[in-house]
Amino acid sequence: MSERDKTLEHAPLGRESAYPEHYDAGLLFPIPRQANRAPLGLDDAALPFEGEDEWHAFELSWLDAKGKPIVAVARFRLPADSPSLIESKSWKLYLNSFNQTRFDRREAVIDTLERDLAQAAGASVAVALFGVEDDALMPRALPGECLDDLDVSIEYYTPTPGLLEVGEEIVEETLHSHLLKSNCPVTGQPDWGSVLIRYRGPRLERDALLKYLISYRQHQDFHEHCVEHLFVDLMARARPERLLVMARYVRRGGLDISPWRGTPGERPPTPLRLARQ
């Protein structure tokens, strides 16, 4: 049994769980990143990328000092160099534990979230709260050229980096696809997503790139590690000067996850949400 499998044996994901009635930071379940990174040749002490895991939580509520419910949408930014990610069902259960908990101030909610999530992840986690009608939550479109209308024949549905091809021309461009699909490593549930690739380097052949992205269709892994797998393969096969890979996964259980990884200095487009999130 792998180290990851040993860890996931005790995770709430895939198990029946009682929903908490009282605040409980102990519900958060960290998963060390290194166990999944080792097969990719990655070392936490010398990562070839920067990045974050951006989460949105749409089912966040608490009580004010008088017992009146307050609702909000939360955005969390978990750094890619944190020792651990946080298992999604445990995160959901933790947020549900706020439902009947009283807070005097909105800032107290943020302080509590930042403290507890940092403790679980082993690094600072940025927290922002939005009103449910905030314009920042409106869906937007991914920048760049969409690959999805290319006429390609597909043979592979597990990650196949050998599909990637590059030309001799050096370009700087942004490409995206909405055909990304991977699967939860615990439950096997499908994880649907969109992926953006921004780079400067030898021109990626579009047909080959789309075939490669589709090859994740039967792959089982966490969202965060799928993005790291994409990054590692693209760096190895295309050797770009600069690279950003960002996936925006469809919401499940009131949470969506949008990891990005980039070469030093790269940053994703302005925070955005897609229609499927």
From Swiss-Prot:
Record-listed E.C. numbers: 1.7.1.13
Residues annotated as catalytic: 184, 191
Pathway given in the UniProt record: tRNA modification; tRNA-queuosine biosynthesis
Binding site for substrate: 86-88, 223-224
Annotated Gene Ontology cellular component terms: cytoplasm
GO molecular function (one): preQ1 synthase activity
Chain sites annotated for binding NADPH: 88-89, 252-253
Keywords (A to Z) from UniProt: Cytoplasm, NADP, Oxidoreductase, Queuosine biosynthesis
GO biological process: queuosine biosynthetic process; tRNA modification
Catalytic activity annotation: 7-aminomethyl-7-carbaguanine + 2 NADP(+) = 7-cyano-7-deazaguanine + 2 NADPH + 3 H(+)
Location of this chain's protein in the cell: Cytoplasm
PANTHER family linked to this entry: NADPH-DEPENDENT 7-CYANO-7-DEAZAGUANINE REDUCTASE
Subunit structure comment from the entry: Homodimer.
Similarity annotation: Belongs to the GTP cyclohydrolase I family. QueF type 2 subfamily.
Function of the molecule: Catalyzes the NADPH-dependent reduction of 7-cyano-7-deazaguanine (preQ0) to 7-aminomethyl-7-deazaguanine (preQ1).
UniProt-recorded name of the protein: NADPH-dependent 7-cyano-7-deazaguanine reductase
Organism: Chromohalobacter salexigens (strain ATCC BAA-138 / DSM 3043 / CIP 106854 / NCIMB 13768 / 1H11)
Lineage: Bacteria, Pseudomonadati, Pseudomonadota, Gammaproteobacteria, Oceanospirillales
Gene assigned in the entry: queF
